[in-house]
Amino acid sequence: MRWFVYAGCFKTKWSGAFLFGLLLLLSRLALSAPARAAGRFDPVGLVNPFIGTTRGGDTFPGATLPFGMVQLSPDMPLRELPNGGSEAYDYSGDFISGWSMTHLSGTGCWNYGDVFFTATTGPVHTHAAQYGFLFSHRQEQASPGYYRVFMKTWGINAQLTATLRCGMAKFTFPSGRPANILVPISHVMTRLSHPCYLHFLNNHTLAGYVTSNIFCASRSARVYFVLQSNQPWKSFGMWKAGQRFPHRRTIHQKHQNHKIGAYITYPAPTHARVVKLRIGISYVGIKGAAENLKAEVPGWSFSDLRQAARRRWNRALSVVRIRGGTRRRRVVFYTALYHTLLDPTVFDDANGLYRGYDNKIHRVPAGHRHIYANFSGWDIYRSEIPLLTLLKPRRVQDMAQSIVEMYKQTGFIYRWPAANAPGGCMVGDPLTSCLVRIWEAGLHGFDMKTAFRGMWHNALAHHAKYFRADANVSADEEYDISFAALSGLAATLRHPARAALLAEWAEQYREMFNPATGFMQPRLPNGAWLPGFNPAAYGAHFVEGTGWEYLWLAPQDVQGLVRLLGGRKAFAAKLTAFFSGHHYDPTNEPDIEAPFLYDYAGRPWQTQYIVNKEARKNYTDTPGGLAGGGNDDCGTMSAWYVLSQLGFYAVDPGTADFEVCSPGFSRSTLHLSAPYKGRAFTIAAFRHSGRGQPGAEYIQSALLDGKTLSRPWFTESAITNGGVWKVRLGAKPNRLWGAARKDAPPSLSSITGFGPVKYLAKEGYTCSRPTGPLTLNGNMAAYAQRVPRIIKQSLLLTNSHNGEETSVWLNRRVLLAAPWQASFDYLLRRGGADGFYLVVQNSRAGKKLLRGSDGSDKGLISGGMAPRHSLGVGVENFRGSELELAYGAPAGNTQRRMPVKLGGTAPVNFNRPDHMIHVMVSYDGARTLRFQATQSGKRFTKNISLPMPLAKLLASREGYIGLTGGTGALNETQVISQWRWAEGASTRRPAAWPTPAE
């Protein structure tokens, strides 16, 4: 805690400043002595709320409770920061406008600042520049649940404390001047506030509401309040647009520029006057605010509320107890822990009612205590949620249910909901990752059936945005992370087809990797690389980062990324170049997991070195000492520090695993709570200096519950079941510990595994899935002979020699007898192509590849058209764009065709380069095939009556599906992507085939 005592208060004249300084010193002694006398653990005394209040940290020093709806904190005049962010309070300032009841911690964007009030002496002023005040940090004090400052301009001593939904202010006015309470309700941090309303209910109660834009001015929300004074007032009034209206009881603001406010004036006292205000807020209504006030602040004892807040914070912070290290390092640690316990925030009233995202009034679901709001999704899924699953499991389950309620009310899971306003700030689908992490941690106290439905809905909606015109690499990588998380959950919940499809989507980050440059790069809609790429350039297709930073953002598949970059040695070399070349940004989210990636490359000692170095350098006990000056983003950067100092971090948000680094303290204990089985998990680090200096920071050996731990990771259950992790540290790295390939943390690639299924193409060739889209040509032998069980989503059918056909079997059994539907996107990239066919074979056909000649119809033979047992439907451009139904003849390698001329009259041109066509082929289960193609909003549809031989072919219960294409000329390319296969009325589905209709 930082205690600021006015150095010049000891003067012969007993001024207000002297009294303030004396009271400040006495309060310090009074609060600290009992704790020391009793020997109780008092982590509140190790929290400095001023850490992070400058250099862009954007934290607030005011009074709040853990996850409280109210954050009663000072606001300074609105001003932009050099980095484009903004904050309500900056430690470098010396002028405060007043206080407001709502804030977010560390978001770097104008937000909240609702229900603003202040105090003055003398004449009533209605402009912020006039009613604000100068102050000195020597006369300012902050600790969890309490804030105090001496208002030099007015000679007023101000103190603040808070409950969950309410706050109390205590003003000690000097004698000899009128005392004023001002409520400039239109004053909000977003600058935009209307409509607003104020009403004097009686001579000690003011009520009203303020409507303000929420988070980066994206949406609006309304906050209702009730303000009461312990001293009835006789002189009061309102103002609008600077004009005062004495004794007016009600006022509305309907236009942005007509700002309103209320004032209360007390006569000049002959001695110091103490005025207390208690303020309750609600997002439901004025009645809700009044009930919150009645439930939480029934009396007027400021000290009782302050002590209650301190007790609440001591309980919350005592969930982690550390030993060792300097006092400064302990202050940094507990302040970081404090910051992780601020958001998300409680959003329901004391009676259990809350306003939903649909703007309707709802009740907290049965079995849950609270509804939470303010999910900084893009940030918190990385570190905040993994930490909270350990420390606050019951709250986290309520948070998960709150996300589910958002889906029920809006039909979507938004990535950055604030208050009751659904928001889409940033990119990706981060709250899916949050829900999965919570579930995988064993916290099942929320409606997963509805949650999964919402996450699946999100996944389908987001996947349609791939390869968009803005070529946003960051967005695609972020989506891959959530796809991987949901894939693992789908497998757990026994949705194998969806799990397979999502796992495939999760690996699409590889399609953004350009082996020529060694970086993830944006692509154009036609698949070509966007020109002018510079990996060090900030922005431009990378959200808040560079190509260097986003090279590493594949936490779901780090082992796949290792292979993509050429193996462990090449991966580690490039990662080292990333750090040594000053490309790493420890102040922001995109690459905060990067130091832990050495654990995947057989060099955990380098993870230990980098983490310790960055923690010491960027986290200090100064106002600018949070993440090197970055936004805390609702506890995300603070959570990184807390986890890293405990000795582990969650790289992959979709699993319940933690990657290891060296602990920062000699002993740390996590006190666990239900529903976890364990009572405590202890981290004991031996031979650690504990002084925050370079030295004994390298893991030499480790024991987990008495058993040797030789790998640089463990599961979350190892913690939540309780136990002891003992780590022996040394001054020199042990390059063997955790270095074996088998010891690397699991990734999507390693979980999916590799199977014996092979893609088949022209006689004599097999190929595996390469790092990019699958290319079928005459050079496939260069690829390895084993491929993943899950097919790639995009296939490139390319010929390097004139007149060669290519084909690929998807090697999945499908149900033919029932209705089915296959669909895909078809793109001709350059030149002309002979066409393509969707090929279906019954189970007796086999998959023997036969030689073919030119033409995509002959490609059916190359693709394995077996006599009597095969059917192909597709487009033959070689004869002038015919829709053909081809099937095997009774004998030999010839075909029968049912051509349907398309010619130049068809609305869809299959021979037009770089114009995507969506193709759908469906079977009604009887005698009809339906072929449909859509291009640029125009659609071609044809129903084909099957002859009896084909009807019998499809009567076979099971079969195989494949694709064949003929390019017919040098360097002609077709791209097939977005595969879908769905069966109707099916009682048996393929084990691993993508089935969105499941």
Task: Locate each region found by the language model.
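Bacterial N-terminal signal peptides
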Residues: 19-28
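Signal peptide processing junction and immediate N-terminal pro/mature segment
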Residues: 30-36
